[in-house]
Amino acid sequence: MKEQLNQLSAYQPGLSPRALKEKYGIEGDLYKLASNENLYGPSPKVKEAISAHLDELYYYPETGSPTLKAAISKHLNVDQSRILFGAGLDEVILMISRAVLTPGDTIVTSEATFGQYYHNAIVESANVIQVPLKDGGFDLDGILKEVNDDTSLVWLCNPNNPTGTYFNHESLDSFLSQVPSHVPVLIDEAYFEFVTAEDYPDTLALQQKYDNAFLLRTFSKAYGLAGLRVGYVVASEHAIEKWNIIRPPFNVTRISEYAAVAALEDQQYLKEVTHKNSVERERFYQLPQSEHFLPSQTNFIFVKTKRVNELYEALLNVGCITRPFPTGVRITIGFKEQNGKMLEVLSNFKYE
């Protein structure tokens, strides 16, 4: 057994609504607002696509997801040879880490970001440098100071999970210009579709300028397919060729591929969902207490407080399951009614 596994623990999901009801003696409905899922669900066309292909379940998937690859290639205007799919971004991160890292290698990322960058590096016996956040966001200058010719991977999450903050195009361009050209910079844009900031990076354009800039996106968030597990990376043809050796032959299921293609084709539905999210998100920042909220470009808001357990339980008491962290609580933006209940709690809560 790998000794470094002793440094890690298996992922622990939050308690189910039923378990929470029993623990806290809560009556009535509970809403799961802890995992940043798209509560509106996928496009109706996704359900139609799934129903149309149920008779194919006994077939193995087509390896490499060629139908979805062609759709993504057209959507992003990138060559198919530069795209690799995984069963969610979790698997994409795992494949890249497994392909690149050897014992003693070093990755550089941030503290308080998506935990799978750290997790998979430790599994591969690599060292992890985690730079503290600055004003709740990635400190690109601080990360740059830790990067050198021997760095194996740099992981950036934009917008960042769990804080919701982002860095802009100019900042990323400047950062990439100073990273050694052979050091891969992985930019995780899982929440890209929710972004409304005009100065958010055009990472695809930056890829034309920097061969070591690699882009990750997913169908789990705005497209509403978290239960079907489809994520992908857009990288250099050479990197994809090598990483593809690591990919399990049938990692993305046949139904998942059909569903993702249907979701991608219904951009009007995506626009409707992301617009609803931005409208509801703005309601939180209209509160006088929003000084305690980190600025978000996602479908969640990070609320800073020293009284984490008290806030978590106060939100739970109005039927909203959220996600506590050491320095605050992450709230998935819900429907109007759910948000109204949370806004009432947040407007009366004592944060210090």
Curated annotation (Swiss-Prot):
Q: Write the Enzyme Commission number(s) for this entry.
A: 2.6.1.9
Pathway in which this enzyme or protein is active = Amino-acid biosynthesis; L-histidine biosynthesis; L-histidine from 5-phospho-alpha-D-ribose 1-diphosphate: step 7/9
- Its domain of life reads Bacteria
Broad EC category:
transferase
Keyword Transmembrane helix listed? The answer is no
This protein's record includes keyword Amino-acid biosynthesis = yes
**Record keywords, A-Z:** Amino-acid biosynthesis, Aminotransferase, Histidine biosynthesis, Pyridoxal phosphate, Transferase
Q: What Pfam families does this protein's entry cite?
A: Aminotran_1_2
What biological process terms from GO does the record include? L-histidine biosynthetic process
Gene Ontology terms, MF aspect: histidinol-phosphate transaminase activity; pyridoxal phosphate binding
Q: How does it assemble?
A: Homodimer.
By its UniProt entry, which HAMAP family does this protein fall under?
Answer: HisC_aminotrans_2
The name this protein goes by in its record: Histidinol-phosphate aminotransferase
Q: From which source organism is this entry?
A: Staphylococcus aureus (strain MRSA252)
